[in-house]
């Protein structure tokens, strides 16, 4: 069983990363949705220092931007209150034009893995929305348009620049968002080969219905299938997420394909030192379903108890095995 923690301000010191590796953690994920690989050099250097100190070949996965939809950069967090009107696009919250063009009146718009929700009222160069579920919106948070598919390139210009820097920063794997076809993975492999990085492991994220349903067509083109429950839950609806995870697990088992489960495994531990019983059962059952890897995100990136979260993840996985 492989286990990963997401890098962030809460854990990115060489001594702390060394402690996590000594506990048995396999490696780390670096989320590039909010930043660039070059800007994260202090963090990747901390990983390399931890590798040397622990004597363990810790994996370093970079999670690419890819075709996923995201809010632009905000000067400061924006509170959204249920019932209020907000504008997306010119004169309002920064959203890319192709996203705005895909929105029709009545469209539900989910933000930050569904934590907040809007309903589109009128559409044009800008989209006027009503907040249906409030919260505090931060820069670069995810946008989901349930039922809408946008055609975007597998790799952005920034992704290609990040791959240019990968060899010099100890990267061992890439995680490709919103995989829906074999062609997208072939594009990733070609980009890696052009940089002499064909040895890097490719994690392919399933984040919508199309990616889930087309899994048999592209499964063998990646190294590890990733059940990315944040956007997958937003796109399918939470009630359909358990069936999707079970089905993906069964397909991977039959094909002998390794798969990873990620998102809110121990979410409570972002703020509390122990998980809930439901979280313990969730992780335990993921192992019983055949998961070959588990990954923490906010629990270690920004949580108050990163060491305890990793310890719980390791203990639950070992107990299940």
Predicted regions and their residues:
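Non-catalytic helical/linker scaffolds that mediate oligomerization, partner binding
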Residues: 1-321
């Amino acid at each position: 069983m492989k286990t990963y923690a997401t890098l962030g301000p809460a854990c990115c010191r060489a001594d702390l990363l060394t402690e996590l590796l000594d506990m048995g953690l396999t490696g780390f994920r670096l989320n590039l949705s909010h930043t660039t690989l070059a800007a994260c050099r202090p963090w990747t250097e901390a990983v390399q220092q931890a590798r040397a100190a622990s004597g363990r070949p810790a994996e370093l996965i970079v999670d690419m931007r890819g075709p996923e939809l995201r809010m632009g950069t905000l000067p400061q967090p924006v509170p959204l209150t249920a019932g209020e009107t907000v504008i997306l696009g010119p004169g309002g919250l920064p959203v890319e034009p192709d996203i705005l063009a895909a929105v029709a009146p009545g469209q539900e718009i989910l933000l930050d893995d569904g934590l907040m929700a809007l309903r589109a009222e009128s559409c044009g160069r800008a989209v006027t929305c009503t907040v249906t579920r409030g919260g505090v919106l931060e820069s670069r948070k995810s946008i989901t348009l349930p039922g809408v598919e946008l055609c975007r390139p597998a790799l952005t210009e920034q992704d290609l620049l990040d791959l240019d820097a990968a060899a010099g920063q100890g990267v061992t794997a890439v995680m490709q968002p919103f995989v829906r076809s074999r062609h997208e993975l072939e594009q990733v492999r070609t980009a890696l080969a052009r940089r002499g990085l064909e040895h890097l492991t490719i994690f392919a994220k399933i984040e919508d219905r199309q990616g889930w349903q087309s899994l048999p067509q592209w499964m063998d083109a990646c190294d590890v299938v990733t059940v990315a429950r944040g956007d997958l839950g937003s796109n399918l609806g939470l009630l359909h997420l358990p069936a999707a995870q079970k089905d993906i697990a069964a397909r991977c088992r039959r094909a002998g394909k390794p798969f990873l489960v990620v998102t809110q495994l121990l979410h409570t531990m972002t703020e509390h030192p122990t998980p809930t019983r439901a979280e313990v059962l969730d992780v335990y059952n993921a192992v019983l379903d055949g998961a070959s890897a588990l990954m923490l995100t906010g629990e270690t990136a920004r949580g108050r108890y990163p060491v305890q979260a990793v310890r719980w993840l390791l203990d639950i996985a070992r107990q299940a095995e």
